[in-house]
Amino acid sequence: MLNIVMIGCGAIGAGVLELLENDPQLRVDAVIVPRDSETQVRHRLASLRRPPRVLSALPAGERPDLLVECAGHRAIEQHVLPALAQGIPCLVVSVGALSEPGLVERLEAAAQAGGSRIELLPGAIGAIDALSAARVGGLESVRYTGRKPASAWLGTPGETVCDLQRLEKARVIFDGSAREAARLYPKNANVAATLSLAGLGLDRTQVRLIADPESCENVHQVEASGAFGGFELTLRGKPLAANPKTSALTVYSVVRALGNHAHAISI
């Protein structure tokens, strides 16, 4: 059985814990949350058949088989970098954080120093394998369009573009590079950043973000072309009830990645 420590226990982390309840090969031994949230999270997880320990930091000398980040961008700095340097392999959900200048290089250096490895999870998007394979032969263009319910953009710069609460028809709230999208919309940047890292990079990947009052799904569209030919992907993801900014597929992506580490055959 893999010994797993998870950073964060919000909508994504809680969903992962629930799905792992009946998997005999996978167990989250501990979750790491801010100190002032420990009691609340411990109470919330008490109903699980196998509740994990709730900690504010990884105890000195403790070496789990895997550390899984489900907590947002700050957790990369606080927990993932030190874990990699200590030789602990890490899975990362908050790929948008890697748009920060120099962070990719720091993560790579920490992993090399510790002899460990970092795996970036696809989360809410698919076709990452096809995109990264196409890059080998030469990519020419990659465009990502993200369409979400208007309410999912509350608390973002989209509020300065239009009145999201009174929006009557779909409105483009951003059109530019993936790097700029990640800077302005960090909580919605994971898909764009993942596509960029797999393909043409943050500056050459084009991003369009749309607020749609008639949509009840998070719709991700990817168009790519190059020496390989081209492809178009449309993925309609149901948002998590606990967080409309996040697709439920993100939770399933984490569980799938953990299964690939635990089981004899992975795909």
Swiss-Prot record:
Belongs to the L-aspartate dehydrogenase family. It comes from Pseudomonas aeruginosa (strain ATCC 15692 / DSM 22644 / CIP 104116 / JCM 14847 / LMG 12228 / 1C / PRS 101 / PAO1). The active site is at H220. Pathway: Cofactor biosynthesis; NAD(+) biosynthesis; iminoaspartate from L-aspartate (dehydrogenase route): step 1/1. The keyword Oxidoreductase applies. HAMAP family: NadX. Its EC number is 1.4.1.21. It catalyses: L-aspartate + NADP(+) + H2O = oxaloacetate + NH4(+) + NADPH + H(+); L-aspartate + NAD(+) + H2O = oxaloacetate + NH4(+) + NADH + H(+). Specifically catalyzes the NAD or NADP-dependent dehydrogenation of L-aspartate to iminoaspartate. NAD(+) binds at A124, N190. One of its GO terms (molecular function) is NAD binding. PANTHER family: ASPARTATE DEHYDROGENASE DOMAIN-CONTAINING PROTEIN, L-ASPARTATE DEHYDROGENASE-RELATED. The keyword NADP applies. The iminoaspartate product is unstable in aqueous solution and can decompose to oxaloacetate and ammonia. Pfam families: Asp_DH_C, NAD_binding_3. The gene is nadX. One of its GO terms (biological process) is NAD biosynthetic process. Keywords: NAD, NADP, Oxidoreductase, Pyridine nucleotide biosynthesis. This is L-aspartate dehydrogenase.
